[in-house]
């Protein structure tokens, strides 16, 4: 009887092609031992051959660095949004390729931001869209696994609600209080407390990542059988200052505490209003005025490992050392000045109230 590994590698042309790609990148020494360990894990858990193959695809893509997606079959699935996109199939699973945005000053780093942001979320245990860096016909892309399957519909937060809520859409300007009201009012949500917790935990991670574009259209729910479940986190291309393309400017910012602080305390702001205005992540979190936010901070902050995040950044071979240092600098300062500061302040208040 053949093992799962022998079944997968022997019978599946796509798997064999991924093996060839990984070997061409001199990853055989890493891939081999890791794959056997992965096989033993899945067999112990009694996974099927299909589950093994799908897992193996992720295993190889994560270790193969920049992949060339040019020759993968098209999925012929259309995607909206402002960025150029192409749908492809990897081992019969649909992926969306997002292209690097062009500006008069060069290419934006939205693809790298998408990749880093998604992987940070996954490091922290959030359900998040799988992403892989690569190229397509010579252009830089990030491959994002499509999590919309048959019978499942994505419903953005902007569109969630009962008819009674929809009638009041203009009233809801998506302040924090309004978000709470909307979530509590929607009786189709399967677990309202969990959804509320997840939203505020996502906000904490977005604060670390300096996400300037989390809005009611790029987070929401999966609808199946008329029930709503929180969707995986996706659309992280606005993290970590993707418009910053000038390395001389990066160096100036890193050498100037005032410039760093502007990018910590003042911008980017979140897209959700606080007291009628766009809110600074620092203002909202450090105010400690939202109990749900405080609980999210306690839940998320202790699990943030900057060392692992920096290792992830160091493995990206399409950005310079200056650019990597810029990412690390901004993450370090946002971690210390927004999250750690607020966490210490919160725990101090809790101790005083004991």
What are these regions (language model features)?
Residues 1-204, 208-210, 221-354:
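Phosphate/dinucleotide-binding and metal-coordinating scaffold of catalytic cores
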Residues 215-216:
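Canonical protein kinase catalytic loop motif
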């Amino acid at each position: 009887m053949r093992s799962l590994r022998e079944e997968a590698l022997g019978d599946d042309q796509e798997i064999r092609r991924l093996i060839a790609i990984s070997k061409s990148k001199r990853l055989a020494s890493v891939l081999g031992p890791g794959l056997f360990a992965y096989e033993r894990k899945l067999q112990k858990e009694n996974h099927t051959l299909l589950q093994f193959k799908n897992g193996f695809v992720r295993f190889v893509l994560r270790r193969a660095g920049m992949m060339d997606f040019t020759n993968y079959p098209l999925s012929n699935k259309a995607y909206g949004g402002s960025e150029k996109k192409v749908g492809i199939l990897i081992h019969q699973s649909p992926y969306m390729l997002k292209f690097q945005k062009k500006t008069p000053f060069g290419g934006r780093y939205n693809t790298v931001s998408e990749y880093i942001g998604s992987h940070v979320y996954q490091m922290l245990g959030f359900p998040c869209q799988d992403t892989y860096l690569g190229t397509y016909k010579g252009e830089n892309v990030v491959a994002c696994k499509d999590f919309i399957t048959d019978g499942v519909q994505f419903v953005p937060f902007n569109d969630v609600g009962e008819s009674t809520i929809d009638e009041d859409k203009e009233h809801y300007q998506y302040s924090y209080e309004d978000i709470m009201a909307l979530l509590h009012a929607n009786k189709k949500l399967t677990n309202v407390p969990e959804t509320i917790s997840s939203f505020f935990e996502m906000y904490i991670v977005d604060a670390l990542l300096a996400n300037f574009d989390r809005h009611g259209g790029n987070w929401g729910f999966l609808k199946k059988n008329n029930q709503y479940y929180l969707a995986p986190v996706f659309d992280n291309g606005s993290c970590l200052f993707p418009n910053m393309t000038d390395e001389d400017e990066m160096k100036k910012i890193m050498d100037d505490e005032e410039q760093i602080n502007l990018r910590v305390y003042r911008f980017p702001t979140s897209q959700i209003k606080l007291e009628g205005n766009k809110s600074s992540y620092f203002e909202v979190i450090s105010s400690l005025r939202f109990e749900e936010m405080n609980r999210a901070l306690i839940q998320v902050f202790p699990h943030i490992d900057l060392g692992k995040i920096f290792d992830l950044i160091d493995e990206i071979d399409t950005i310079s050392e200056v650019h990597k240092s810029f990412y690390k600098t901004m993450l370090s300062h946002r971690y210390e000045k927004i999250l750690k500061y607020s966490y210490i302040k919160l725990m101090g208040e809790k101790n005083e109230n004991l």
